[in-house]
Structures are given as structure tokens and as C-alpha cells.
């Protein structure tokens, strides 16, 4: 068992045992240090955040792991494009070949770089919506400037809730109904990427995997969200298979 798997098991376990409690106590101390660092970073970035000349919409979450951000941003880009807008998706391209230096995956007409350089998700998004530019890079201010030159009139920040260098006009936060608040602790004690109070910045919440949660669970989630951000709109989404795609199996 890996250390990561062991820690995840402890996070989920309501009765971790004596050794587990000691480990969790240590992780809680680290979580406190992590939180202070996150808050300090947010305050510094917030003071210098750039306002772009076109609207910026962020789609993100507050927990580590997948909550459905990619399907959401694809749907949003598709809807905006159908309404006559020219959105562009800005992704960090985590662990991609161009994460540090940045690059254009698609200019809205054709693919410009390989999947290896782009990263799996940005490349998939570029294939899925070929009319929408997709750009990668840690510095999304630079990506935004490139997107505007390509004709974008709306910027979509993929996984943007913790990207504080750019001001946004709409913050959409996805909440996974199966584990909405990351066991109630910040990393590494829990899965929160920043303190719960950060949800006050949100303008819209989308509850994902709603079909997997009881009504009472969703009611509790909504109460917590309303307490933190009474101004925010709360929506629900459902996951369901749309088609089966045949796959080829490769063997060595």
C-alpha cells in the first residue's frame, strides 16, 4: 500500500485506531500550516490581480480530485459559442510539456501541438470543441493575452478557483455530492485545497453527482453553501452515460 492510499484510508475512516489518530494529528498540524500558506498566497495575489479587457468565467472546485470540471467547461464553451460568442479555454496543462512556457493547443481552427505537449485533458477539449481555442500554461495572464489576439471575447478558466492572479466576472464552483467538503479538513488532513470560508467568493455552485446523494444529504450541502455564500446561485447536475465507445486493446 502506498503512503497516499494509506492517508486516503485514514481520511475516510471514522475509527482509525491509536496509530491512525496519531498520524491524523500530525496531518492536522500540517494542514494548519498549509492553510496559512494558502491564505497568505491569496492575499498577495489578490492585491496584484489583473483585470482583463473581456469577461472572465472561472470553473473550479475547493477539493482535490475530480468533480466534473472538464465536462462543465466544455458545456459552457459550447453554449457560449452557439450564442454567437467566441470563448477561449485557458488551462494550466498540469504536468504537460508546455505547463511552464505555455502554448496554443488549438486556435479554434486547427490543432497546433501534440497531445504529449498539450496534456491529455486540454488536447481532449480541443478535439471535442474544435471551434473554440484552447491554451495551456501556468501563467494564464499570458494565455489570456494570446487568446484575445485569436479573437476571444470571453475567457474560461479551467480549474480557476485557486488561480488568483486574474480577476473574474463569474466564479462557478463545483461541489461533489459524494464528498462535498473533503472530510472537513485542508490538505493533507483532508482534501480541501483552501479553507471552507473561501467559498464565500463563489457566484454559482453546481452540485455534481446529484443522483448519487439522498435528498437529505443535498439539503445539508445546500444549507452549508447558503450559510457561506447566501448570494450564490445553487444548481444541480447529474452524471449519466450517453453512449458506448468501442475501444481497441493493445498488448505487448
Label every PLM stretch briefly.
Residues 43-95, 106-107:
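Walker A (P-loop) phosphate-binding motif
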Residues 250-251:
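Conserved small/polar residues in nucleotide/adenosyl-binding loops
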Residues 234-245:
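Beta-strand-loop-alpha "switch" segments that mediate conformational coupling across diverse proteins
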Residues 59, 175, 237:
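Hydrophobic residues at beta-strand termini and immediately following loops
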Residues 54, 85, 132, 154, ...:
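A structural micro-motif
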Residues 2-54:
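A transmembrane-helix-recognition feature enriched in membrane-embedded lipid enzymes
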Residues 87, 171, 234:
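Hydrophobic anchor at the start of a short beta-strand
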Residues 94-229:
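Phosphate/Mg2+-binding loops and adjacent switch elements
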Amino acid at each position: 500500500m502506498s503512503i497516499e492510499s494509506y492517508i486516503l484510508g485514514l481520511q475516510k475512516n471514522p475509527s482509525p485506531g491509536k496509530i491512525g489518530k496519531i498520524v491524523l494529528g500530525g496531518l492536522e498540524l500540517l494542514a494548519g500550516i498549509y492553510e496559512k500558506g494558502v491564505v497568505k498566497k491569496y492575499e498577495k495575489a489578490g492585491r496584484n490581480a489583473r483585470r482583463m479587457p473581456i469577461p472572465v468565467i472561472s470553473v473550479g472546485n475547493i477539493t482535490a480530485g475530480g468533480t466534473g470540471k472538464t465536462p462543465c467547461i466544455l458545456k459552457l464553451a459550447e453554449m457560449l459559442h452557439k450564442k454567437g460568442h467566441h470563448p477561449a479555454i485557458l488551462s494550466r496543462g498540469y504536468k504537460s510539456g508546455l505547463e511552464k512556457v505555455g502554448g496554443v493547443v488549438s486556435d479554434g481552427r486547427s490543432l497546433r501541438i501534440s497531445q504529449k505537449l498539450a496534456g491529455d485533458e486540454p488536447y481532449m477539449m480541443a478535439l471535442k470543441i474544435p471551434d473554440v481555442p484552447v491554451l495551456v500554461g501556468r501563467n494564464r495572464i499570458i494565455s489570456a493575452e494570446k487568446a484575445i489576439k485569436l479573437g476571444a471575447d470571453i475567457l474560461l478558466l479551467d480549474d480557476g478557483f485557486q488561480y488568483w492572479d486574474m480577476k473574474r466576472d463569474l466564479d462557478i464552483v463545483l461541489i461533489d455530492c459524494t464528498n462535498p467538503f473533503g472530510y472537513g479538513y485542508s490538505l493533507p488532513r483532508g482534501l480541501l485545497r483552501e479553507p471552507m470560508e473561501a467559498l464565500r467568493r463563489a457566484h454559482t455552485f453546481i452540485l455534481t453527482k446529484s443522483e448519487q446523494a439522498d435528498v437529505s444529504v443535498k439539503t445539508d450541502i445546500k444549507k452549508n453553501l447558503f450559510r457561506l455564500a447566501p448570494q450564490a446561485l445553487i444548481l444541480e447536475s447529474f452524471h449519466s452515460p450517453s453512449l458506448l465507445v468501442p475501444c481497441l486493446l493493445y498488448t505487448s
